[in-house]
Amino acid sequence: MKTLFALLFLFTFSLVSAGDRTIRGTEELRAALRELKPGTTLRLAPGDYDGGHHVRGIANLTITALDPEDPPHFKGGANAWHFSRCEGLTLSHLRISGQSGNGLNLDDGGELDSLVGGITLENLEISEIGPQGNNDGIKCSGLENLTIRSCRITAWGGQGIDFVGCHRALITGCRFEGREGFSASAGIQLKGGTSEVMVEKCHFLNAGERPLNIGGSTGLAYFRPPGATFEAAGIVVRENIIEGSLCAAAFVGVDGVEFSGNTILFPEKWIFRILQETTESGFVPCRNVRVARNRIVFRRLQLRTDLNIGGNTAPETFVFAGNQWFAEDRPEASQPQLPVVEKDGIYGRDPR
């Protein structure tokens, strides 16, 4: 009887552990990718690995470091990794650099009405993507229930993180740092019908022209869901630090944003931008944004205007409340020119 139980235990253990593999080097990785099954965990040993890997339709895949203190480093390729329709994907403790396209590309395989869910990205280091052009650190299209946590993205050509038609997502505790020589249009961009996204506790340092591009401009064929009438809606941006760049945040074709509790330090041309870049029939004007309880430090000498307000927008629907505004070089000129009257604003007192 004891022998029977022992055999049953060994059989059960072998089933559980069969999908957990240790990988050493690019060739072992390529071989493992050819044999992938749902539920596989790949633990990658330290060292350099080639980029250029593509995985499609494998559910509950985990790719992580064998030693989180010495993560594997994926160098080069158009993309380090491209995952299409990989439900339940987890990537953690990986380094990625030197790609000519995107660092990571995750998508729905072009099935615009069928979102891919349950993806987690954490403790990733992504750098030197591009350097010039629409080359993203992390590109996400048609995903839902997505978490990006504790990632560091440095030097990219397009967006640090780019969401096109993604829903119910959290970006938390990440750092975005631009670098001279990389074109970097945005730190985070949320567009193409994206909704219900929270960005919190992130740090943006010279993170592109628009560290937070909430909304944007998307070709009609790429909206998820098809027929959406906004670039982004139901977005929460809270408790972030935003340093430098031409502006702190741009609201572009959005319908509902809460921007609160953030610290803004020394934007170079405007504090905020209110824009409408998608003007096709049926699209709502940029509207319904609440800017509250932020700490905003700037220099009058640097700013062209406090806000850049473009055409086809609805700035009268914005709410400003309880923000602390401080012009470091001219404290007496700290009160900004806003499109609506602010409630309980604080002006001329250094909030740092």
Identify the residue ranges that each predicted region occupies.
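Glycine- and acidic/polar-rich repeat regions and solenoidal domains
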Residues: H54, K75-F83, S97-G118, I126-L146, ...
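Extracellular beta-strand repeat scaffolds in secreted/surface proteins
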Residues: T40-L44, N323-F326
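Bacterial Sec-dependent signal peptides at the C-terminal "C-region" and cleavage site
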Residues: F11-T22
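Sec-dependent N-terminal signal peptides
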Residues: T3-F13
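Beta-strand repeat architectures
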Residues: L33-T40
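Bulky hydrophobic/aromatic "packing anchor" residues in well-ordered structure
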Residues: I23, I63, I346-R352
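Right-handed parallel beta-helix/beta-spiral solenoid domain characteristic of secreted/periplasmic
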Residues: D20-E27, R43-P46, D50-G52, R56-L104, ...
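Short acidic active-site motifs
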Residues: E28-A32
